[in-house]
Swiss-Prot record:
The keyword Nuclease does not apply. This is Ribosomal RNA small subunit methyltransferase G. GO terms for cellular component: cytosol. The lineage of its organism: Bacteria, Pseudomonadati, Pseudomonadota, Alphaproteobacteria, Hyphomicrobiales. It is found in: Cytoplasm. Gene3D superfamilies: Vaccinia Virus protein VP39 (3.40.50.150). It comes from Allorhizobium ampelinum (strain ATCC BAA-846 / DSM 112012 / S4). Pfam families: GidB. Specifically methylates the N7 position of guanine in position 527 of 16S rRNA. It comes from the Bacteria. Its main location: cytoplasm. It catalyses: guanosine(527) in 16S rRNA + S-adenosyl-L-methionine = N(7)-methylguanosine(527) in 16S rRNA + S-adenosyl-L-homocysteine. Keywords: Cytoplasm, Methyltransferase, rRNA processing, S-adenosyl-L-methionine, Transferase. NCBIfam families: rsmG_gidB (TIGR00138). The keyword Repeat does not apply.
Length: 211
């Protein structure tokens, strides 16, 4: 993918150096994905569109995070992509939570070789709050339904009432929202995906347990 097409699809202007880091990550991903399962096989040939662009669109919504936590980082989407985009800035950090040791090893390599602003934590998601401090942004992609995600994230939400979530969801997102409202109160902004007509980014804030 060309740098100009990346900019057109995401609305993000990045330096040549940052684009080269993204390109290097894609090459690295290709090598590692031959050995370990990082994403569904059906999407490996569409890495830029299905994964890089899909992840980068979050940064347009939250361009100046101080402490971003990506839950279930897997193949690095959106965690590594966000950390690479943050490398243009003087502050901001991404903590990537991934309990699978092989995937965690890939993520560490990706962060190191791209000079991205992030760190990998090979712990279970439900235990991550014990070692990770307050954050202002949480992301998760293809991880769990909203109710379970909110349960995972509630320790951070209790500490920071201004916590924001950026969550990729598919066509059935509304049923997840409705189910989550049985146990949680929250504000919601729905952003259409830049790639998929039936996919959205849910921007959630003000999360609290229903009384």
């Amino acid at each position: 993918m060309s740098a100009s097409l990346f900019q057109r699809l995401t609305g993000l202007r990045v330096s040549r150096e940052t684009y080269e880091k993204l390109d290097h990550f894609v090459d690295l991903f290709g090598k590692w994905s031959k050995v370990i399962n990082l994403v569904a096989n059906s999407t490996k040939d569409q890495i830029w569109h299905r994964h890089v662009i899909d992840s980068a669109q979050l940064f347009k919504l939250r361009p100046n995070p101080q402490h971003w936590i990506d839950l279930g980082s897997g193949g690095g989407f959106p965690g590594v992509i966000t950390a690479i985009l943050l490398s243009e800035k003087s502050d901001g950090w991404v903590d990537l939570v991934e309990s699978n040791n092989k995937k965690a090893a890939f993520l560490r390599t990706a962060l190191m070789e791209t000079g991205a602003r992030g760190r990998v934590h090979p712990v279970r998601i439900e235990e991550a709050h014990k070692s990770l401090s307050d954050c202002d942004t949480i992301s998760a992609r293809a991880l769990a339904d909203l109710d379970l995600l909110f349960s995972y994230a509630s320790p951070w939400a209790e500490k920071n009432k201004n916590l924001n979530f950026l969550l990729h969801k598919g066509r059935d997102y509304q049923s997840e929202v409705n189910n989550a409202r049985d146990r949680w109160t929250f504000d919601l902004i729905i952003h259409p995906s830049v790639l998929e007509a039936d996919s959205v980014i849910l921007e959630v804030s003000g999360l609290a347990r229903s009384k």
